[in-house]
């Protein structure tokens, strides 16, 4: 409740984040509807806390280039739902995060996660991360910086065809290309 949020907000190590008003798939909204949804939540934050959070987390980790642009105009940072370690090479409007919850939150896993190294990359394609009929399957290419720890041991997994499996990858020195075998199923 808001009293608990206000209590947390007083702690010096806590940042309250924005996650939309409806917690629906923003990519399914018309442009004006997703903007209204964000603005509704922002109005509530301003009324209850006296400010709008600087952090945004995309509901279900989904966003389009248009949504990302709106968020980048109104927030300082945003998080997807892809796992990874934040470092200086990451786009501050596509930050990775690890789920820590009742299913994925035991102490052993937490200790493992805080000791991970980031995969630092120069280029990540495609720019439009939202998969539609016209770009399914996407062509996914990552160009890494050189001299990274264990980079040759990289593996990728995807749920193409609605079943999780190890992805086909080509890894040539520092460029990784994912060659998806099947189209992704839509929800």
Feature map (PLM): residue ranges:
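Glycine-centered structural positions embedded in regular secondary structure
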Residues: 48, 78, 142-146
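Terminal accessory/targeting
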Residues: 23, 97-187
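Metal-dependent polysaccharide deacetylase catalytic core of the NodB/CE4 family, i.e.
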Residues: 1-66, 89-96
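Generic serine detector
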Residues: 20-22, 42, 57, 64-65, ...
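Weak global preference for isoleucine
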Residues: 5, 16, 35-38, 44, ...
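Active-site-adjacent pocket scaffolds in enzyme catalytic domains
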Residues: 1-17, 68-129
């Amino acid at each position: 409740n808001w009293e608990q949020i206000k209590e947390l907000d007083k702690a010096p190590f806590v940042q309250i984040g924005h996650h939309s008003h409806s917690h629906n798939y923003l990519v399914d909204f018309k442009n004006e509807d997703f903007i209204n949804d964000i603005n509704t939540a922002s109005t509530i934050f301003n009324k209850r806390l006296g400010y709008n959070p600087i952090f945004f987390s995309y509901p279900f980790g989904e966003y389009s280039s248009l949504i990302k642009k709106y968020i980048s105009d109104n927030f300082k940072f945003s998080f997807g739902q892809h796992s990874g370690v934040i470092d200086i090479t990451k786009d501050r409007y596509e930050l990775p995060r690890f789920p820590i919850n009742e299913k994925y939150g035991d102490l052993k896993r937490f200790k493992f996660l805080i000791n991970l190294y980031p995969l630092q990359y120069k280029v990540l394609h495609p720019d439009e991360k939202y998969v539609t009929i016209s770009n399914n399957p996407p062509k996914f290419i990552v160009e890494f910086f050189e001299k990274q720890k264990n980079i040759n041991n990289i593996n990728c997994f995807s749920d193409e065809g609605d079943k999780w499996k190890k992805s086909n990858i080509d890894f040539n020195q520092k460029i990784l290309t994912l060659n998806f075998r099947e189209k992704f199923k839509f929800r």
